[in-house]
A protein has these predicted regions:
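DUTPase catalytic domain/fold
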Residues: 1-131
Length: 131
């Protein structure tokens, strides 16, 4: 069993066979037509360094025009802040998100790296490991 823990707002899986954990908005927000906004989920994930977490669109929302802008968003094991979801409204109207709405899915996957690793720790913030 892989040790994955959550702090803050704990995401849930819909069924025992669901690959993704549902991430929820922590605030009411309006996303204007054509705009992209960052929404804090209040969720902090702690997981082993051989995994990364992918923030993926919810299929039902994507079908209606709301999707994760950088899908999949990649979260490294050394990211130490709450998860933010960058949502893009592809519709011609404003999109209302209410606190508690499911806005994305979080899926954990193993990965392989090769060669030299240049740094031991992260120096950048959201979306950055530096330069």
């Amino acid at each position: 069993m892989t040790d994955i823990r959550f702090h803050g707002v704990k995401p849930t899986r819909a069924t025992k066979h669901s690959a993704g954990y549902d991430l929820r908005s922590q605030l009411d927000i309006v996303i204007p037509a054509g705009a992209t906004v960052g929404i804090d989920t209040g969720t902090l994930a702690i997981f082993p360094p051989h995994l990364c977490a992918m923030v993926c669109s919810r299929s039902g929302l994507a079908l209606r025009g709301l999707a994760v802008a950088n899908a999949p968003g990649i979260i490294d094991a050394d990211y130490s802040d709450t998860i933010k979801v960058l949502l893009h409204n592809r519709t011609k109207g404003d999109w209302v998100i209410e606190a508690g709405d499911r806005i994305a899915q979080l899926v954990f996957v193993p990965f392989v790296v090769g060669g030299d690793i240049p740094a031991d720790e992260r120096t950048g913030g959201l979306g950055s490991t530096g330069d």
